[in-house]
Amino acid sequence: LIHSAEINQLDPNTKYYYRVKTETETSSLYTFITESNSSDEVAINIIAMSDMQQDSNFPNKFNEINNAIIDYFNQNYFGDLNESLDLVLIPGDLVSSGNNYNHWRDHFFSQSKELFSSVPFYPVLGNHEENSELYFKYMDLPKNGTRGYKEHWWYKDNSNVRIIGLNSNDQFRISEQLNWLDSLLNSTINDEDIDFVFAQLHHPHHSELWTPGNTSFTGKIISLLEEFTETSNKPSIHFYGHTHGYSRGESRDHEHLMINVATAGGAIDYWGDWPQHDYEEYSISEDEWGYVLVQVTAG
């Protein structure tokens, strides 16, 4: 069971302290920091990680990844975690079965509570969420997508970055989503507050470690992002998961990057275990657990 509360009239880029109380319990004291206005433009740090659905051979791997993130920021930055880490992106497969309450409680929330008690996260649906009611109950995402598909695709701005969440699952590979994205990107071209576009979706277009996961719909998304980047001269990235490993590449003729953000808990897709391919747009692929840190500089 997750409760939510809406707090209004908060100032931007401000630290707030909070506790959670029930009739019988009171939590420890936590903090969060509100986002800056896009027009104020500040440097931000973003973590991206995906596919933390539990591997029975390493059931606490997601907790290890979360602790590694916290340790990294403690060692390399001063102050509280949320003073140096602004948000976390998750391109799908948060749990093994989105319809299983215990998976949400035991495999996801309990293993990430130290991180997500102070830093917001923004996921998109993977195939393992199964379009479940529990996902939509637990998440509170921007509701600015196509009418009838709210929280399936959405966008939000943080500093000079526009973050776009998409749904690449079978039944949502539809023209409504592509048209919405095309319109949004067109409106972003001349937005002086936005310098970068980061999109996230679950399925790859090309996967070097696991080619059965390749999805032509993602290729259409990439084409729209490449066209946007060419027209606007604003770099774009798409983050994805589905393949349990890390890959990084760049479109040949465009300032568009593609990053498989590595599995944060699911079983690794090892070299030699699956159909695989060496695609020219990729510079590196590794069969490892991990996460990605993106540092965005103001200006």
Give the role of each language-model region.
Residues M52, A199-H205, H238-R248:
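Histidine-centered catalytic micro-motifs
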Residues I90-V95, T188-W210:
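Short acidic, glycine-rich surface-loop motifs adjacent to enzyme active sites
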Residues D86, D195-V197, S236:
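Conserved acidic residues
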Residues K15-T31, N102-D193, P212, S216-I237, ...:
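Extended active-site neighborhood of metal-dependent phosphoesterases/phosphodiesterases
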Residues L1, A48-D71, G98, K137-T146, ...:
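Acidic/histidine-rich helix-loop elements
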Residues V42-V124, E129:
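Conserved, compact domain cores that house catalytic/ligand-binding motifs in diverse enzymes
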Residues V42-S56, N160-D170, F198-H202, H256-T263:
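Active-site-proximal beta-strand elements of phosphoester/diester hydrolases
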Residues L1-P59, D71, Q75, G79-N82, ...:
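Acidic, histidine-bearing metal-coordination/catalytic regions of metal-dependent phosphoesterases
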